[in-house]
Every structure is written in C-alpha cells, then in structure tokens.
Regions:
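Short N-terminal binding/cap micro-motifs at the start of the first secondary-structure element
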Residues: 11-16, 40-41
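Glycine-rich beta-strand-centered segment in the early N-terminal region that forms part
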Residues: 22-36, 46-97, 102, 110-112
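Short structural boundary motif marking the start of a folded domain
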Residues: 1-5
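Short, basic and Ser/Thr-rich N-terminal targeting/leader segments
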Residues: 15, 27, 60, 141-143
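Sterically constrained small-residue positions within well-ordered secondary structures
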Residues: 7-10, 22-24, 57, 138
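Generic structural detector for well-ordered beta-strands
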Residues: 18-20
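NAD(P)H dinucleotide-binding glycine-rich loop of Rossmann-like/cofactor-binding domains
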Residues: 13, 90-145
Length: 145
C-alpha cells in the first residue's frame, strides 16, 4: 500500500489515503514518484467538468525514480530518473521526429494511468515512457546568477 491524495466525488475535499497498487505486469515500470503537478485538466476532473471516474488520484504529470521493471522491459533499470508523460507518443509522426512528442498527431491520450492514478509506486506500461526526450531540465527554468 502507498499513500495518495484521493478525490472521491466532484468537488469533494481531497484526502490522503492508503491505496493498493496493482501487481507489476511484464511490460510495466514501477516508478517511485518524486513530484507530480496538478494542472488545469486535473482541476477540471476534480470539479467534474471532464467527468472522470472516481475515486481519482490527481496529478498526471510526474517525475520520479524507477523502482522496479517488468521482465519484458528493456531500456529502463532501477534507479533511472524519469519524467512521466500523460500520453504515449508514436515517435514516428512529423512532430515526434522533430523531437516534440507532446505535439504528437497520433497520441494515445490518457488522463493518467489505469484507474486515474499516478500514486507513488504506480506501475506504468512502458509504452507510456518510450519518449525519453524530456529530462528534468525541461520543466525548470534556468536560474539567474
């Protein structure tokens, strides 16, 4: 079990709860979430505008460290720092080839991972992690000296 912020109904007060994690599949990567952002689409899900499935764990944009990989996973290992993308880019369209997978025209969008969660320790199918073009630096501005 892990702790997660859970919203149980539209406009309900978020609560910290312990939730069960599904078993790790052979093509999954389990990530220990270091941080997750709550963006406008999360707020729209929380207030019911986007009609998500409740209960919901908001925060579908996250970064963390790979904790465990499934047997069929290659290219990732425990300890790898990763940024989780909210959608699986095709890596073949014009935008993906240009290094802009967030604009993918064939994207398989997800509000988050299965069950609407990105709780700490959630297993993410490796297809959602194939685009490693974004590092931590893509989410931070350069500090002035």
């Amino acid at each position: 079990m892990v702790k997660a912020v859970v919203v149980t109904a539209p406009d309900a007060t978020p609560e910290v709860r312990e939730i069960n994690l599904p078993p790790l599949g052979h093509t999954d990567v389990r990530v220990r979430i270091a941080s997750a952002g709550v963006c406008h689409s999360d707020l729209s899900m929380i207030n019911g505008t986007l009609a998500p499935q409740f209960p919901l764990v908001p925060g579908h944009e996250a970064s963390g460290v790979v904790a465990e990989v499934g047997q069929a996973v290659t290219g990732f290992a425990g300890g790898d720092r990763v940024v989780l993308n909210w959608a699986a880019a095709c890596r073949e369209c014009w935008f993906c080839v240009q290094g802009e997978p967030w604009l993918c025209t064939a994207v398989e969008g997800v509000t988050s991972v299965e069950g609407g969660t990105l709780a700490d320790g959630t297993a993410v199918n490796v297809r959602l992690m194939k685009s490693r073009t974004l590092g931590y630096e893509a989410f931070t501005g350069k500090s002035s000296s």
